[in-house]
Amino acid sequence: QGKKRTGEISTLQYIFEFQSMICELTNMDVANASLYDGATATAEAVFMATSQTRRNKVLVSKTINPRILDVIKTYTKYRDIEIIVVDMVDFCLDKEALRTKLTDDVAALVVQYPNYYGVIEDFQEVVDLVHNNKSLFIMNADPSTLSVLKTPGEIGCDIVCGEAQTLGIPLNFGGPYLGYMATTNKLLRKLPGRIVGM
């Protein structure tokens, strides 16, 4: 009985520490206990945004990994959510194209940081455009880069998610992968999965 209890406490402790580290890396308020992988975490972030805003259109930058886009489309196919891809210019999000697509029924914009082409985009103007439209800004970010790049929290992200395998998990036959997600206190109740607190 004592050993089992110690095991449970140890598990809760390391999950809490994982969440704390993700919050430190991303500079966000709260993180969950992880998700399947980075792509499904991004799809879950889309669900969070549509639920929070009660809107059914989501813009996705063409500069994200096409496999992540495929997963988002698969997840949203039967959920009455319209996915609209925003074009790119010089391997960066086309801000003019974004302005034309940013209508009052858009729940969120999804971007990748650094993007699929390895470009570190400056999203400050984009975040302002999205927030002025009362939409949410979702960032799929590589956590191994966040110790040197401007953090999602500093940029003004509402939801940050991604693939945490890059933090050092060895790959074996196509896995294991680890999706992470962090958000603001305002969106805490919409966060999927489990949260370990103290």
Language-model-detected regions and their locations in the chain:
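Glycine- and acidic residue-enriched flexible segments with recurrent GG/GxG motifs
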Residues: 1-2, 67
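Conserved PLP-enzyme active-site core in the AAT-like
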Residues: 40-198
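Conserved N-terminal alpha-helix of the aminotransferase class I/II PLP-enzyme fold
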Residues: 2-41
